[in-house]
């Protein structure tokens, strides 16, 4: 019974009201936003949803993937600023199990989220202008934090058009993500609980749990642009991100900044000035690297 509770609780992320919605954001900022609610289908047939802000025809797109326990609203402000600075198309999915009344009730700690990220990329690449032409350029960017960073990295290893990645506080594997959630939920950090959580999760997913390492995905990237971010607000993820930085092959252009006072892990609740500095760092990277490949 303990193992069943442990796994069930971990696979159901906490759900809270959105920090902000596009409608509230428009009222507060007096911007004429064109953010729309969109739906598509994941590769396993489950439904997916996200907010979409269309950019200029022929400009790149960026898909923004939040961390475990957060939701798309944490990065609405960041994505709007990215669109305003670059005219890129921006898509904010809710990862499975996240957001209000999620269409899929459970998270898989990155195992299924890799395919979900690929489905989001396929969706944004399917967008058309009113004249029927492709909306977005061939190259695109992926931004992710923690669980979202793992999904961004592992999906990019299978999607060569993902040319630019901003990866913040990256767990080493789905097991690493799972055990962090179990520690947070129970306050327990010992080998027995870790063993039970890992074994129970594999039984729960009936053989459909893939514990692929982030390092293996990094080695497979080839010629891409990657910005790795981490900081003191998530020290265990700073360690795994620094370890990840040593996995990339020489062909991958990697920039590493792991001494940040603020990361995307706490960005949704960060004070304004710190958040502005963080946003500018990521926006400038996407602007510089995606325009170079566009």
Language-model features and meaning:
Residues 107-134:
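Alpha/beta-hydrolase active-site loop
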Residues 68-82:
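The serine-hydrolase catalytic nucleophile loop
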Residues 1-40:
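An N-terminal hydrophobic leader/cap segment in hydrolases
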Residues 132-146:
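Alpha/beta-hydrolase fold nucleophile elbow
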Residues 154-207:
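Hydrolase active-site cap/lid region
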């Amino acid at each position: 019974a303990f193992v069943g509770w442990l796994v069930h609780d971990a696979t159901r992320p906490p759900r809270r009201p959105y920090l902000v919605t596009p409608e509230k954001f428009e009222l507060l900022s007096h911007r004429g936003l064109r953010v729309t609610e969109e739906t598509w289908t994941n590769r396993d047939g489950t439904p997916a949803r996200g907010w979409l802000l269309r950019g200029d025809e022929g400009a790149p797109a960026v898909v923004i993937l939040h961390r475990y326990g957060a939701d798309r609203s944490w990065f609405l402000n960041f994505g709007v600023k990215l669109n305003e600075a670059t005219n890129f198309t921006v898509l904010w999915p809710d990862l499975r199990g996240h957001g209000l009344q999620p269409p899929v009730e459970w998270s898989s700690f990155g195992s299924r989220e890799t395919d979900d990220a690929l489905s989001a990329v396929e969706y944004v690449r399917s967008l058309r202008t009113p004249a029927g032409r492709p909306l977005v350029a061939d190259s695109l960017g992926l931004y992710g934090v923690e669980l979202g960073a793992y999904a961004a990295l592992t999906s990019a290893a299978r999607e060569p058009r993902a040319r630019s990645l901003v990866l913040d506080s990256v767990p080493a594997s789905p097991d690493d993500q799972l055990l962090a959630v179990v520690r947070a939920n129970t306050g327990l950090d010992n080998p027995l609980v870790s063993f039970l959580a890992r074994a129970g999760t594999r039984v729960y997913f009936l053989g459909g749990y893939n514990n692929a390492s982030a390092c293996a995905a990094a080695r497979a990237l080839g010629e891409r642009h990657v910005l790795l971010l981490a900081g003191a607000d998530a020290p265990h993820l700073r360690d795994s991100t620094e370890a990840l930085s040593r996995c990339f092959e020489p062909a991958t252009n990697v920039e590493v900044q792991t001494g940040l006072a603020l990361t995307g892990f706490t960005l949704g609740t960060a004070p304004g000035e710190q958040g502005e500095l963080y946003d500018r760092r990521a926006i400038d990277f996407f602007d510089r690297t995606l325009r170079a490949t566009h």
